[in-house]
From Swiss-Prot:
Tissue expression from the record: Highly expressed in brain and in Leydig cells in testis. Localized in nests of Leydig cells (at protein level). Expressed in choroid plexus (at protein level). Not strongly enriched in cerebral microvessels.
GO molecular function: bile acid transmembrane transporter activity; organic anion transmembrane transporter activity; sodium-independent organic anion transmembrane transporter activity; thyroid hormone transmembrane transporter activity
Protein name (record): Solute carrier organic anion transporter family member 1C1
Catalysis performed (reactions): 3,3',5'-triiodo-L-thyronine(out) = 3,3',5'-triiodo-L-thyronine(in); L-thyroxine(out) = L-thyroxine(in); L-thyroxine sulfate(out) = L-thyroxine sulfate(in)
Gene transcribed to yield this protein: SLCO1C1
Length: 712
């Protein structure tokens, strides 16, 4: 064979043979120089997004840790605190639909950066009331600045040195104090600041997660999302720890002489420096915005995601309505042109049964989550007699790390075992069921009510009493002119707490430094006392001896439950991402976030708070006579309301999760069979084509070149 023929053969062999009308599957891989910027920028975005998640989670965790502090500082009920907490979701609701839909078609990193700035400003606004309100005034018994002087608490109204109840004040004095008390409405700034936080946080999840999922490889997407979600859990750890630290500092630190403060962090009237953490969180949020202004609008897609639209597994669950969802290109894209596909996109999402059912499941589950997390510090304080600082410390250092570990473990499991969509749904359901069963055991790990004379036990300390305001008075204090609206708890030698030293019938008192001791208390004397004394000290008595052990058991079960439930977080999120069209991903995440905010984030803290308020035994009163925050809860009723609501919502969530798995299996089996049939036909066709290609290659070999066989 001549040289020209050999060159033609070599050239032909180097060229892939393609059938007529079939596109080439040859892909030109970018060089290492081309790959590096893409991977580098994606990792920069991953780090920036993780830091933003940390910042927003820090502020959110800190807000949860200051719920009790805000309630006491502004003297408002739990239901109103729930409204303040829900204002974050209201802010999300205002813009989530537009941000998730239009933001996906614009410069996503810059939109996230702008959101961080708004979020930081809102966080700083929350702290502003501290600098405009008058100093915090708590109800206190002040015998005298002279430590050697003894005054009878029983003759409270006759002493000009002591504060009296608003019920005994003259109308003119009440009117004057009401004018000063207008600062209590400053909680509206906390509401507005949290509202701004919600608006600023809106683009972070739908645009950030979709950006990662778009440009990361399919194998790494779950791992990257798991990393982001894990960092997001680390944020609340620092948030609750910061809350624990600030709760130990007096609210007006730097503004008053702390030597004059007679209460301690264990006192139910104590308010910590709740505002300090918001200043720190606000600055961190502003710093988190910086990297996003320098990131590109888009990145080169990963090689494994080039054909993601035709993924065989994903196609089993996505309903194709043959609508062409085109994204306008260029900076001059018109708003009306982008809005044209809004309703068809929305119809496509809600027409997807897997997406719709999972949306319902998550909404119910997040109702229980939002309500439980919002009032968990209060539950620990009231149920186990712990201080606010200790409750926040325990949640931040023990409970939340278990959640972070569970989320990270879920991402690792998804990556390592390459779990399918059905497998992800099973893992999600399994973790929910197991966590639900563990949670049921918390009903048995409660503490009994503290013995409070006239509220939970009689003045003789022998039998429980039903709550009635007049039950605070008894024969032992009938000659004392006491206020029934005050809350100045005194712990008697008999282990019973009295609403005030006056209601305990105490005749004399002594003050030594910050300690106040009451003597000759007639009501203490009629109840059994271990020492036989009829004295008492300022503050509530500790819970019974078995309560610390119950608290330890509660922590252990709570940690295991948190880990188990969070293990299904990433599988559930991957299920959400894989059951929708790629071009609708940001929009679907936005609608998902919208539903969670509207149907869970806003109402859950409110109705949890309203129902928790029904367990209040002793309300505080403001200077104008209106009802303030709750001073004492019925521990048993509180426990059954708090845990019962969570269990009811968890039951509904599990039933919906079973429905999701049923739909997935039904679609998987039917479409998988159809896919196999098509695959068999394709394999037969491919085998025939390969035989022809092999014959063609054989005919082109130098040792076989018969001139008469011209057909290929």
């Amino acid at each position: 064979m001549d040289t020209s023929s050999k060159e033609n053969i070599q050239l032909f062999c180097k060229t892939s043979v393609q059938p007529v009308g079939r596109p080439s599957f040859k892909t030109e891989y970018p060089s290492s120089e081309e790959k590096q910027p893409c991977c580098g920028e994606l990792k920069v975005f991953l780090c920036a997004l993780s830091f933003v998640y940390f910042a927003k989670a820090l502020a959110e965790g800190y807000l949860k840790s200051t719920i009790t502090q805000i309630e006491r500082r502004f003297d408002i009920p739990s239901s109103l605190v729930g409204v303040i907490d829900g204002s974050f979701e209201i802010g999300n609701l205002l813009v989530i639909t537009f941000v998730s839909y239009f933001g996906a078609k614009l410069h996503r990193p810059k939109i996230i950066g702008a959101g961080c700035v708004i979020m930081g400003v809102g966080t700083l606004l929350i702290a502003m009331p501290q600098f405009f309100m008058e100093q915090y005034k708590y109800e206190r018994y002040s015998p005298s600045s002279n430590s050697t002087l003894s005054i009878s608490p029983c003759l409270l109204e006759s002493s000009s040195q002591l504060p009296v109840s608003v019920m005994e004040k003259s109308k003119s004095k009440i009117s004057n104090e009401c004018e000063v008390d207008t600062s209590s409405s400053m909680w509206i700034y906390v509401f507005l600041g949290n509202l701004l936080r919600g608006i600023g946080e809106t683009p972070i999840q739908p645009l950030g997660i979709a950006y990662l999922d778009d440009f990361a490889s399919e194998d790494n997407a779950a791992f990257y999302i798991g990393c982001v979600q894990t960092v997001a859990i680390i944020g609340p750890i620092f948030g609750f720890l910061l809350g624990s630290l600030c709760a130990k500092l007096y609210v007006d630190i730097g503004f008053v002489n702390l030597d004059h403060i007679t209460i301690t962090p264990k006192d139910p009237q104590w308010v910590g420096a709740w505002w300090l953490g918001y200043l720190i969180a606000g600055i961190i949020s502003l710093l988190a915005a910086v990297p996003f202004w320098y990131l590109p609008k888009s990145l080169p897609r990963s090689q494994s995601r080039e054909d993601s639209n035709s993924s065989s597994e994903k196609s089993k669950f996505i309903i194709d309505d043959h609508t062409d969802y085109q994204t306008p290109q260029g900076e001059n894209a018109k708003i009306m042109e982008m809005a044209r596909d809004f309703l068809p996109s929305l119809k496509n999402l809600f027409g997807n049964p897997v997406y719709f059912l999972y949306l319902c499941t998550s909404t119910v589950q997040f109702n229980s989550l939002f309500g439980m997390v919002t009032y968990k510090p209060k539950y620990i304080e009231q149920q186990y007699g712990q201080s606010s600082s200790r409750a926040n410390f325990v949640i931040g250092l023990i409970n939340i790390p278990a959640v972070a570990l569970g989320i990270f473990s879920g991402g690792i499991v998804m990556k390592k075992f390459r779990i399918s969509v059905c497998g992800a749904a099973k893992l999600y359901l399994g973790s929910s069921v197991f966590g639900y069963l563990l949670f049921l055991s918390l009903f048995a790990l409660g503490c009994e009510n503290s013995d409070v004379a006239g509220l939970t036990v009689s003045y003789q300390g022998t039998k429980p009493v039903s709550y009635h305001e007049r039950a605070l008075f008894s024969d032992c204090n009938s000659r004392c002119k006491c206020s029934e609206t005050k809350w100045e708890p005194m712990c008697g030698e008999n282990g019973i707490t009295y609403v005030s030293a006056c209601l305990a019938g105490c005749q004399t008192s002594n003050r030594s430094g910050k300690n106040i001791i009451f003597y000759n208390c007639t009501c203490v004397g009629i109840a059994a006392s271990k020492s036989g004394n009829s004295s008492g000290i300022v503050g509530r008595c500790q819970k019974d001896n078995g309560c610390p052990q119950m608290f330890l058991y509660f922590l252990v079960i709570s940690v295991i439950t948190s880990y188990t439930l969070s293990l299904g977080g990433i599988p559930g999120y991957i299920l959400l991402l894989r059951c929708i069209k790629p071009q609708l991903k940001s929009f679907a995440l936005g609608i998902y976030t919208l539903a969670i905010r509207v149907l869970a984030g806003i109402p859950a803290p409110v109705y949890f708070g309203v129902l928790i308020d029904t367990s209040c035994l002793k309300w505080g009163f403001k200077r104008c006579g209106s009802r303030g925050s709750c001073r004492l809860y019925d521990s048993n009723v509180f426990r059954h309301i708090y845990l019962g609501l969570t269990v009811i919502l968890g039951t509904v969530s599990i039933l919906l999760s079973i429905a999701v798995l049923f739909i997935l299996k039904k679609n998987y089996v039917s479409k998988h069979r159809s896919f196999i049939t098509k695959r068999e036909r394709t394999m037969v066709s491919t085998r025939f084509q390969k035989e022809n290609y092999t014959t063609s290659d054989h005919l082109l070999q130098p040792n076989y070149w018969p001139g008469k066989e011209t057909q290929l």
